[in-house]
Amino acid sequence: MEMLESKPLSAISMVIDSIGVDHENQNKCNCCNEQIYDRYIYRMDNRSYHENCVKCTICESPLAEKCFWKNGRIYCSQHYYKDHSIHRCAGCKKGVSPTDMVYKLKAGLVFHVECHCCSLCGRHLSPGEQILVDDTMMTVSCMSHYPPQMDDNAPGAIGSAVDIPSCSTENPIAPYPIDESFSSAFQVKKEVDAYGYNFEHYSFSDFCDDDSRMLKRRGPRTTIKQNQLDVLNEMFSNTPKPSKHARAKLALETGLSMRVIQVWFQNRRSKERRLKHLCNYLRHYEQRGLIPPPIHFRNEEMDTTDFNAFCGNFEEEDDED
């Protein structure tokens, strides 16, 4: 934008250049369509404007020092980038100004700070927080919505979502009991966190073997006393899979039936395997400097600080042999 000064006496060169030019139309304001007699003239794209007519088309604020021109319309800096910026906020779908504070994800999405919210619950997402990115819909959501809820009537659907457990390097990791009714329907999925570093999001089914499939209850629950549990734990530490003869000796020593002892060892071996998978799963996050989200179970919460107490209550199941 240039500002011209109309002087009473013009130079000879300007007079020569002005020959054949329609001064009446040249000095007509492009905004109000009135003739300009002011001392100063604003000129943009070979169009003249009154000083007072140079205003933002949107907010009508006067633009004395700087303005933007697009398709015959004048804008202030804020509204020009809001309507015509090549970078668009994935949240509000409006343009991004060079002075705006934004979050830029590795997936190519850009969000205003105030627009960086979960698309499902509307919660504001903080810097460094792990998020789920949908490249197709260009949305983000918080980890509490993973895995997504599925229709109970759909084939292979799961009744409710199971979240991923959290871990801390300051406190020891307590063994988590894994719900045996959890189906292995989820697959490994890659996501991107708030800083754009790739990490693989695993569900529990990726770490469980065939023994984690849902088993049907067929007998009453049996509670083992502490002295009986101590004998079984001692045997398990020496022989995780005792023979039939060893189980018969345990039945005489503890007063429990061979059926109960056999089921207890089956369940204990299964818990040990899943505990090993769970530790590998948590180590997978810690090696990458990531913190998994908290875990919740569909069934009633159980005390995970005492693994022996957890193994004291179990269900009688069919023989594997």
Curated annotation (Swiss-Prot):
GO biological process: mechanosensory behavior; neuron differentiation; neuron projection organization; positive regulation of transcription by RNA polymerase II; regulation of DNA-templated transcription; regulation of transcription by RNA polymerase II; response to mechanical stimulus
Span of domain LIM zinc-binding: 27-86, 87-152
GO cellular component, one term: nucleus
Stored Pfam families: Homeodomain (PF00046), LIM (PF00412)
Tissue note: Expressed in the mechanosensory neurons ALML, ALMR, PLML, PLMR, AVM and PVM, and the FLPL and FLPR neurons.
SUPFAM superfamilies: Glucocorticoid receptor-like (DNA-binding domain), Homeodomain-like
Keywords: Developmental protein, DNA-binding, Homeobox, LIM domain, Metal-binding, Nucleus, Repeat, Transcription, Transcription regulation, Zinc
InterPro entries in the cross-refs: HD, Homeobox_CS, Homeodomain-like_sf, LIM_Homeobox_TF, Znf_LIM
PANTHER family (UniProt xref): LIM/HOMEOBOX PROTEIN LHX (PTHR24208), MECHANOSENSORY PROTEIN 3 (PTHR24208:SF170)
Function: Transcription factor. Specifies differentiation of the set of six touch receptor neurons (TRNs). May positively modulate expression of both its own gene and also of homeobox ARX homolog alr-1 in TRNs, forming a positive feedback loop with alr-1, thereby restricting the variability of expression of mec-3. Required to determine the identity of ALM sensory neurons, acting by interacting with unc-86, thereby preventing unc-86 cooperating with pag-3 to induce BDU-neuron specific genes. Binds cooperatively as a heterodimer with unc-86 to sites in the mec-3 gene promoter.
UniProt-recorded name of the protein: Mechanosensory protein 3
Organism (species): Caenorhabditis elegans
